[in-house]
């Protein structure tokens, strides 16, 4: 079973994080071990918009998964071939557990990235992390990134 924590980075900090994703990962992996979100996480991340995520799940994933259930505040999506996704909400993150094919992860990431471009995921305990929707670099963004390093 694969486990992810997914955060929505505040738009005002996105430009400062680009190129420093390793530092963000180091912070977020520490947050996973705390029952309450760290102060730094509350500062850098938006509160998860549950309606936005619910819409992404129902509108986009409801078409390809056999069952989409909501019980005890947790989404459970089941596909007969790919497997099962469990999604739990906390104020600043989503906790996702995928049991089955890696296609489950891809389906969820595509749905969330279509809903908003600022989602950043870490794979708990595996050292994998990244933007769900890759950031497009313009020349101006690259020049600013060099200045802020």
State what each model feature region is.
Residues 112-119:
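A common structural junction motif
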Residues 96, 121-122:
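Short hydrophobic/aromatic-rich beta-strand segments that constitute the beta-sheet cores
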Residues 92-99:
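Short cationic amphipathic helices and targeting signals
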Residues 1-91, 103-110, 122-149:
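Acidic (Asp/Glu-rich) sequence patches and key acidic residues
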């Amino acid at each position: 079973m694969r486990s992810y924590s997914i955060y929505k980075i505040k738009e005002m900090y996105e430009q400062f994080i680009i190129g420093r994703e390793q530092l963000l990962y180091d912070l977020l992996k520490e947050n996973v071990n705390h029952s309450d979100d760290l102060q730094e996480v509350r500062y850098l991340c938006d509160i998860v918009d549950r309606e936005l995520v619910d819409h992404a799940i129902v509108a986009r994933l409801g078409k390809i998964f056999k069952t989409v259930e909501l019980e005890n505040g947790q989404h459970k999506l089941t596909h007969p071939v790919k497997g099962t996704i469990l999604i739990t909400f906390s104020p600043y993150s989503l906790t996702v557990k995928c049991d089955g094919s890696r296609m489950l992860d891809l389906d969820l990431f595509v749905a969330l990235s279509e809903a908003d471009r600022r989602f950043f995921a870490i794979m708990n305990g595996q050292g994998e992390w990244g933007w769900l929707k890759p950031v497009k670099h313009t020349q101006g963004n690259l020049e600013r990134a060099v200045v802020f390093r």
